[in-house]
């Protein structure tokens, strides 16, 4: 199988939405019965984003095979059916680490190790590995053209055209057309300079996707085509929209997918975007609104909870309601009080690390339990729910996690010291282990208790969900908590690790150690989130009576 490559770069400014544009294009190509994958090349020196602050970088998206990756991979999985793997995201740091290890082993036979060819060859090798078995591979280059950090990646994709042949490679450049209100027009000069910067590296873009808050007029498209040396039909206007799920239709309406198929000489049926039209129909036909409070640690940057926010929106689509998400700083619940929780139809506590804000989260979990408000706890959200229940129902005053209090009298949550990893080997950890690459991470099977709420939602006895954590429920103390009324509705396949807890006599109180948000999509939703939003709607309707 010959793989065709589409390289996506960005210019003028950052945060233009290269990931969304690439994912939307991939969705159209997939709808044409092509086998498609996407990868993200990040120019930072970290080995992976696993230890980068969510306030700086946004969420860490976890793949099925346990890779901690860029949040753009979440967009990829929400737009296409292909599951991402550790091969779909790598960084400058990972490339340099690999090359330096080879140098130490003597793999380069005494050669002087340089950016060209050693670093660029390593980049190309990884791209080819990730693209194997696919008709089309989209490669998004992180950063902005002109950044010094991106140069090795840009040089590598320049070389790849020669390696794979011009008929199997295509460059898309995403750029900004600012609109000047005083002049009443979009300005093309920044785009011209961005393309000029690319040309200086040796890359001539084949397609320009022009981002703007206004539609790009036909005469401006002609001007861009002339000065940037691209065909007019390859100048795509992509103005701001109120829903990212409209973008596949916008790109298709301008013939981008057909242009690419013609370039690659791909004979395939026209795209059937019926499923995306259904998503848009559901968005436009919401019959109500529910307010869900998300009590977190990193609310300054909503991207820190990107997949959770999207999963709530997906569940809203399936319930035909608009989900109004209120981001609540956990620490403020201690300083300002619980007034921020009043009027909510449901409460969600997402994942996180460290002790900051924990007591505020415990207050939120207690409020949801005592006021019979639907509650969904994810990862840390399950742990704080368990701590709260132990303290206030099971009589374990000052119960805590050893992450927050190593000397807790009742350590209801403790460090996982060993478990079986994806290779079947026993992984061992301690408090002194490195932070990076030392978690129980990736897809794990979970056995559900028949008759439980979770079992009713999933409608199957065994599920597979993705994890990312170091701490687990302490099985030595668990029987006391269960005797007080808490139910364990999901365990690992060896029955050693608690995965899901419920409160049977509460309208809807579910908390899980895994991250269900990573497998939610706009076309399918996710059972837990759909059930959660449905319960929020029921709570809202009851409050109106």
Curated annotation (Swiss-Prot):
How is this protein activated or inhibited?
Answer: Allosterically activated by GTP, when glutamine is the substrate; GTP has no effect on the reaction when ammonia is the substrate. The allosteric effector GTP functions by stabilizing the protein conformation that binds the tetrahedral intermediate(s) formed during glutamine hydrolysis. Inhibited by the product CTP, via allosteric rather than competitive inhibition.
Question: Which pathway does the protein contribute to?
Answer: Pyrimidine metabolism; CTP biosynthesis via de novo pathway; CTP from UDP: step 2/2
Residues at the catalytic site: 379 (nucleophile), 515, 517
Give the similarity note: Belongs to the CTP synthase family.
According to UniProt, the name of this protein is: CTP synthase
What EC number(s) does the entry state?
6.3.4.2
Please list where the region (Amidoligase domain) is annotated: 1-266
Q: Do you know which NCBIfam families this protein is assigned to?
A: PRK05380.1, PyrG
């Amino acid at each position: 199988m010959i793989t065709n490559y589409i390289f996506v770069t960005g210019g003028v400014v950052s945060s233009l939405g290269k990931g969304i544009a690439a994912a939307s294009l991939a969705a159209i190509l997939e709808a044409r019965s092509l086998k498609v994958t996407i990868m993200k090349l990040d120019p930072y020196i970290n080995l992976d984003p696993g230890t980068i602050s969510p306030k700086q970088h946004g969420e860490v998206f976890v793949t099925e095979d346990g890779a901690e990756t860029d949040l753009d991979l979440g967009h990829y999985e929400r737009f296409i059916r292909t599951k991402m793997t550790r091969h779909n995201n790598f960084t400058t740091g990972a490339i340099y680490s690999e090359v330096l290890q080879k140098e130490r082993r003597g793999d380069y036979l005494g050669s002087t190790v340089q950016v060209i060819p050693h670093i660029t060859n390593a980049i190309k090798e990884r791209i080819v590995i990730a693209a194997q078995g696919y008709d089309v591979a989209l490669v998004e280059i992180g950063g902005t053209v002109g950044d010094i950090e991106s140069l090795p990646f840009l040089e590598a994709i320049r070389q790849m055209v020669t390696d794979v042949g011009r008929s199997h490679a295509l460059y898309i450049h995403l750029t900004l057309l600012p609109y000047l209100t005083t002049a009443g027009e979009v300005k093309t000069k920044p785009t011209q300079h961005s393309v000029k910067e690319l040309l200086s590296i040796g890359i001539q873009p084949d397609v320009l996707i022009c981002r703007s808050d206004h539609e790009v007029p036909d005469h401006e498209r002609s001007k861009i085509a002339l000065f940037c040396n691209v065909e007019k039909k390859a100048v795509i206007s992509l103005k701001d929209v109120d829903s990212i799920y409209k973008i596949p239709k916008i790109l298709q309406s301008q013939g981008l997918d057909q242009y690419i198929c013609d370039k690659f000489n791909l004979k395939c049926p026209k795209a059937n975007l019926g499923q995306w039209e259904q998503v848009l129909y559901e968005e436009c036909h919401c019959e109500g609104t529910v307010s869900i409070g998300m009590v977190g640690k990193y609310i300054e940057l909503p991207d820190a909870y990107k997949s959770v926010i999207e999963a709530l929106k997906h569940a809203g689509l399936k319930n035909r309601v608009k989900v109004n998400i209120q981001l609540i700083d956990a620490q403020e619940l201690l300083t300002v009080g619980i007034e921020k929780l009043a009027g909510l139809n449901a409460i969600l506590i997402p994942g996180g690390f460290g002790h900051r804000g924990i007591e505020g989260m415990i207050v939120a979990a207690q409020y949801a339990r005592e006021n019979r408000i639907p509650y969904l706890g994810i990862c840390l959200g399950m742990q704080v729910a368990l701590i709260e229940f132990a303290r206030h129902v099971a009589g374990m005053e000052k119960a805590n996690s050893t992450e927050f209090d190593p000397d807790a009298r009742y350590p209801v949550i403790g460090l996982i010291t060993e478990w079986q990893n994806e290779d079947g080997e026993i992984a061992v950890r301690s408090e002194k282990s490195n932070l990076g690459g030392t978690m129980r991470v990736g897809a794990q099977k979970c056995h559900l208790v028949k008759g439980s709420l979770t079992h009713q939602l999933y409608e199957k006895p065994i599920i597979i969900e993705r994890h990312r954590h170091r701490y687990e429920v302490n099985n030595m103390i668990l029987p006391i908590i269960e005797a007080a009324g808490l139910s364990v509705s999901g365990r690992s396949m060896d029955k050693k690790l608690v995965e899901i807890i419920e409160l049977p006599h509460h309208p809807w109180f579910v908390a899980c150690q895994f991250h269900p948000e990573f497998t939610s999509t706009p076309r399918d939703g996710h059972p837990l989130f759909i059930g959660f939003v449905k319960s929020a709607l029921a709570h809202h309707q009851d409050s109106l009576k």
